[in-house]
Amino acid sequence: MILCKTDKRNSTIKPVKRVQSNRAHRLNDEIRGVKEVRLTDENGEQAGIVSIQNALSRAEDAELDLVEISPNAEPPVCRIMNYGKFIYEKEKAAKEQKKKQKVVQVKEIKFRPGTDEGDYQIKLRNILRFLEDGDKVKITVRYRGREMAHQEIGLDVLERVKTDTSEVAIVESAPGKLEGRQAVMVIAPKKK
């Protein structure tokens, strides 16, 4: 059966091109242009080099698919398998892999040069929790008004945070110079 399409302008019939399958592997009758293949049977054992017709008949007898695994090899490598199950397990493994990957986020904690001890301890607890979760922490000390005249007080706060978190974190970017009216330091969790 040939699919056709009529062109309204010229009233001619043109054959429709078949849509190329978007599968990663060629299956069964899609494997063309080769006379012999290196065959692996459904148990994973090497069956040697066989003709394509022999490989197709063996796959049909087993009620499975003949899948071209490595088309660039000489001769191409084919395997007898349940292709639907193969794709399902491959997608399932990819999902599991994606679940295991953690996106590292940068959390920000803001201090002031005159942050009280109780507030400091709460912010330090949050910093340690973020580091345990595997996130980086951006510590910012903001200056207002005349606090700019005593920048060393804010830098002392950053130095104190650095020493208090030295067991679980490393400094990724130390506070070198002010960025506008704030000093910034980024710390990351130590590798386990």
UniProtKB/Swiss-Prot annotation:
Homology family: Belongs to the IF-3 family.
Gene that produces this protein: infC
Function in brief: IF-3 binds to the 30S ribosomal subunit and shifts the equilibrium between 70S ribosomes and their 50S and 30S subunits in favor of the free subunits, thus enhancing the availability of 30S subunits on which protein synthesis initiation begins.
Designated name of the protein: Translation initiation factor IF-3
Compartments it resides in: Cytoplasm
Repressor among keywords: no
HAMAP family: IF_3
The protein's assembly and partners: Monomer.
GO cellular component annotations of the record: cytosol; membrane
Record key words, sorted: Cytoplasm, Initiation factor, Protein biosynthesis
One Gene Ontology term of the molecular function aspect: translation initiation factor activity
Pfam families: IF3_C, IF3_N
GO biological process: ribosome disassembly
Gene3D superfamilies per the UniProt record, alphabetical: Translation initiation factor 3 (IF-3), C-terminal domain, Translation initiation factor 3 (IF-3), N-terminal domain
